[in-house]
Amino acid sequence: SKSSTETPPSYNQLNYNENLQRFFNSKPITAPVDVDPHEVEQSYDASTDARSFRSPLRHFEGSGGSGSSGNFNSGSNLHIGSITNTSNTGTGTSSGSVQLITLTESLLN
């Protein structure tokens, strides 16, 4: 039997396949297949993106365990602060090893 504390699925979870089908039936405008990934990569400003990505994590650093940040204790605050990723700051995908693909309905089936 299921636990009484289990959250029932939401409307969106129950209708995921229908929502996905409706999305593809609407024929959304997508990027052309001949887009050069290197051009897209060069226009990406990694330093701006890195700042916006790290800012929520900085909010938790050193916030203390007195309940000032909701239900976190000081151990979780230290853990959250320690996951800030600075190894790729400002580099984007410099190696070019990540291949961009266009999401199509056939890939999902």
Swiss-Prot record:
Major localization class: nucleus
Biased composition (Low complexity): 69-97
Description of post-translational modifications: Phosphorylated with a circadian rhythmicity, probably by the double-time protein (dbt). Phosphorylation could be implicated in the stability of per monomer and in the formation of heterodimer per-tim.
GO CC annotation: nucleus; perinuclear region of cytoplasm
Region entry Disordered, spans: 29-100
Subcellular location: Nucleus; Cytoplasm, Perinuclear region
Entry keyword set: Biological rhythms, Cytoplasm, Nucleus, Phosphoprotein, Repeat
GO biological-process terms attached to the record: rhythmic process
Chain's role: Essential for biological clock functions. Determines the period length of circadian and ultradian rhythms; an increase in PER dosage leads to shortened circadian rhythms and a decrease leads to lengthened circadian rhythms. Essential for the circadian rhythmicity of locomotor activity, eclosion behavior, and for the rhythmic component of the male courtship song that originates in the thoracic nervous system. The biological cycle depends on the rhythmic formation and nuclear localization of the TIM-PER complex. Light induces the degradation of TIM, which promotes elimination of PER.
Known partners and oligomeric status: Forms a heterodimer with timeless (TIM); the complex then translocates into the nucleus.
Name of this chain's protein: Period circadian protein
Species assigned in the record: Loxocera albiseta (Rust fly)
